[in-house]
């Protein structure tokens, strides 16, 4: 609805509506049987001067306009001016708001000091008439209030709860902030003339850490340090109080205002407007109505203000000189940085603060707690010192007394905030909390000259200070009597008059809360020796955790420095490569080269590697290195993408908006060229942990993943190019599992110009990791010179860096347990605590599963090469292909040829193909995964191919690894002969895995089959299973070798002739010979057991005969013992015949069990003394008579024909030579 405005003279903030609208509202209220009450209205108009549309909110209390104006609303001239300069007859858009929340609390402040003084005088009137003049308020509004319909005061609404637009009620709480008039001080004429515009300018410097030299008895209170040159340039004095705050967007605007300000006071900064633009979010809200839009915007702004006020705390500290800082730096201690959330290498805003503008608060109580610093995620990576000592209450009091007498003499006063931390000595940090107890808060009074001012008089001092500027100190001391402090006490009085007088006690509590809230957020407290000496003010918590305040220091990469490089082993090449790439962007003195080369202001590197390979450790080390390097002083910020993987695209984009904006704001890149700053913004390193979790390779079967990836990549690109700065570049370091797992569209040279692949460490690198991590932990090996660490490293093939470190940690724990046990046993072992025996490290390795092998089923074997007879040429070829590259890696790394990684074992069944694979698992020290052919086949489409991929994936995770496929012809037959097409797809998948561009590094494929002609020929070409080894039916010498190996595990008679046996077993395979020997052994065991059984029967018969003979000669007697009765008389009752019979049976049973137990013991002793069964020639002859070759003559000829054709197709002969098989050549 559009209406014109008519300005009139009235003494309230309500508007009047046209009569027809009022009539319609009355009819509506009667129809709904509801009282109409007041109504909230939203008005919108166009400002022609500023060329923008404005909005405001007003209330209607039932008034109607002059009947002559049917399309107009009326409001007071003062109200129109406060809304934004609404002119008479201006067109307004009007909209009724139905659901406006009742106000819980409204914070207002007088627009001028005159308004504040008038308000103090007319407190009672405001309480009675406020609701009669205004009922709708919103954040940022300026409200005119009439005193007795004559005098006008104006209030600015700073905050409304619970919503940005509220309706006042009798239960609403109104909080008024004081606006005292600045009183002139005693040095108005002299000192204020000395405060020039140059002094009042805000300065922007880079933060560096300040270390306390406790050896010189130095302590830390609340100080910052710059060099003398900067102090003179800024026209500051030693001991001046400086306001420290973060850089924000508004610093540019406020800086311009300060340049145009001709007065002595500068404009206040507003650091509460950090907004992260997201253009796409606006497009999603087009369907919302104007009311919901405005409500949402105001809610977001209100929430952002609260959050930023909490995070961007303003700190006050005195400034001193320290020559260790240069002209671009300010030294700030950890205590201040923790309270103010200031990170090292970020740009901070420093501003001189005049004495009369300090928000000094009276001290009613001081609560002191000991601060215990907790480790953060970065400090856990470096070696920490011993834990902090916990002081008792009496010790803290004594330390405070000694410290205050030494450091707060000469009437020094230091500005502290609530929660400020003071370092008493190297082991004791204390937090000071002021006026945090309700019982200790100074009660409000109605007189401006009451006890607070008198109490502060005791804090005044006229003595000179050698370290602090005398004029500045006098300014602060004299100013502590000004009405500013008294006005703080009078807030409770104003609030009690604005509300009803029936709840006086509740109003006093509210005023106390108001005072405490003001002091907690804005107030500073001047700490002095006199105050700390007052036992009534000082309180120290006692008992348990109440006396301790745990704080976590900021995660500053400066804390790490280059110390992590001392821990990292086996990465020298990667570290050098990363430094060469990053230094061009990080070093400030190379900015000229960047300009000449037209280097972009943004780039990055990708660190790829499996879990536990050291990606995060390397990225963190590089961040710490460039954070402490004086040539870069880079600002480091980290984002863990693992926390974003479940979020929607819109939320992920907002997080990246905040990440880039925060990094640029903290480093000072948002400062305009006109801002007065002494430093160049530092370069920025953004560490993106696990970037592939949110930007993974899109799935072809999921179109949504591709769209999501493209949206995020496009947004990251736009952010990089938006915030790029050649003088202060942005470098991203992303960690991923592999370059293939990361979306390819983001791997462009403009964003990521370098990719570093972290492979599993070699044998020498594992030794280096072991030695460095031991040294890093402050340990060393006992008799290290005589140890063969290379041999121990060879047993950890496939271990990653984290696995080696885990073994060292386990060994340290075992060593500590051993030391405790020695101390408990009073053993005089004087070995150094830092010495670790190598046997403990070997014990720590036992039972440990490397991270790459967890969840993978590996095959273990105890078969050695000497357990295999014959097959000499096959064994030699397997050693050359698999064992040698593992034993001599450097020799093969220098070879320019690609190593052979696929071998096919073929031959008749029972010729030792599977046995050879088992020997490889036991001899070569490689992980061994065995797969039976039919295990991979599945009737469902895609399942078999997925099984093949999973097998090769497990092998790659467990590398170096041997992947053995038995019965290979069953899963990889010739293509085109399967109606279902399952094996065809499996063969295609095998071809993809075996012939990849990257190759199977560290994975050896071993396949065994008896029908090589059935295997698809494509799998047998070079680069795949290119080496075929023939396992032949053993000949005479090979059979003799096999029998000799079997003899070593059996008890053979010396009279047996193995040569004769080898002659008699022609065409026997290795499996046949083993079965023959096992059958002979079983016959020997049966004969031995029969002999023992006959011997036992003979001995048993002899014992029975002897027992019968003895029983005939004598009869066993037994005596029945009868106990006495209670009266010591013996019972005379005799046993019955039945009872005697049962008793006799029990005695016979006991005797029988006794005899049998003796016999069993005797038999066991005899068995143990017996010799094991001996295999004689007779046993061999019986077994040979019952056995025959497992491969018949027809099958042998069939195999020979098959293998001959196979060799002709292959064009070469491999494996053992055999008569009747023609030799093939490559001619």
Swiss-Prot record:
Biased composition (Acidic residues): 264-289
Catalytic activity, reaction form: ATP + H2O = ADP + phosphate + H(+)
Top-level taxon of origin: Eukaryota
Alphabetical list of PROSITE patterns matching this protein: AAA
Annotated region (Disordered), positions in chain: 251-311, 443-480, 1096-1132
Keywords: ATP-binding, Coiled coil, Cytoplasm, Hydrolase, Membrane, Nucleotide-binding, Peroxisome, Peroxisome biogenesis, Protein transport, Repeat, Transport
Family per record: Belongs to the AAA ATPase family.
Function as written in the Swiss-Prot or TrEMBL entry: Component of the PEX1-PEX6 AAA ATPase complex, a protein dislocase complex that mediates the ATP-dependent extraction of the PEX5 receptor from peroxisomal membranes, an essential step for PEX5 recycling. Specifically recognizes PEX5 monoubiquitinated at 'Cys-11', and pulls it out of the peroxisome lumen through the PEX2-PEX10-PEX12 retrotranslocation channel. Extraction by the PEX1-PEX6 AAA ATPase complex is accompanied by unfolding of the TPR repeats and release of bound cargo from PEX5.
UniProt-recorded name of the protein: Peroxisomal ATPase PEX1
This protein's encoding gene: pex1
